Amino acid sequence: MTDQHPTPTPADVWMLVRHRPAVLRRSTQELATALAAAHGSRFALWHTDELLIGIRDGRLTLHTLGGTPLEPPRVVCVRQVAGPMDNDREITLLRHLDRMGATLVNSLDAQLKARNKIWQLQELALAGLPVPDTLSYATAPLEGVVRSPDLTTPCVVKSVNGAKGAQVFLAPGPQLLHDVAGSLARETPFLFQQHIAHSHGRTLRVIVVDGAPVGAVMHTSRHTALAANIANGGTATACTGRHPEAEDLAVRAARALGLHIAGVDLLFTSPDTYTVCEVNAVPGWRPDMTQVTPAITACLTGHLARAAADPQRTH
């Protein structure tokens, strides 16, 4: 693999994206273009597989694969999807950048809370926000979990760190759970969540930046499917400002997790009441949600100004 940055110049703002050959999402490309326009040569985009981290002579170090030493940026815009992050890989890289003095947006603590759906629900519930009743486990055998008297059906079954609607299905009754328990992947736990029938096949996604709702979209599934994700063939309709109570709830959910940038998925418990389904620390957005990219660009510029003014942030 060749070094994609043979003579990198010091950059104040980085965008960190997943390893190659993964294709960048359209929204990530849009944001990268905006950041390049705002910061010029002081902006750089790095893939996680382009960087080497280390310790030399008692100091933390950062290099390209080609051996070129790098100064840490002041601000890192994290666009690596939180769910699939590996604790010993991407998270270790983020921690290294944080310990070298870079400001991560979102912060490492917020990324960790967002990457696990149970961690999210713990924080949201403790903040007094509405969430569906949920059951999960640590090391209990899955065959025993699905026979627990505390597990009620119908329920939605999800991997605790799934993304884009993957590994999500509706279990209408206990027999299906008993039948599939032996064939479900065991790498990560599952959660079993109350099925919100009023919202079946519908999810309201609100993008929150720096404590303000900057875009909202209604996702609707195909036919009678449960998951409304675009990745699963769902449709999307912009609805910014049409559900103010939902947007307020999304702001509170992002705040509870410490997220400056968030995509909050809400379910309808009635035509005008909502519960928090889950929160995404690296949200995507549609081209017609034109306020999102300028809001994130301004958010990162604000973090850059604060980092530059902080004498304790040294490089």
Regions found by a protein language model. Name each.
Residues 8-14:
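Extreme N-terminal starter segment of soluble prokaryotic enzymes
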Residues 124-125, 149-166, 188-199:
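ATP-grasp fold ATP-binding core
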Residues 166-257:
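Phosphate-binding site of ATP-dependent enzymes
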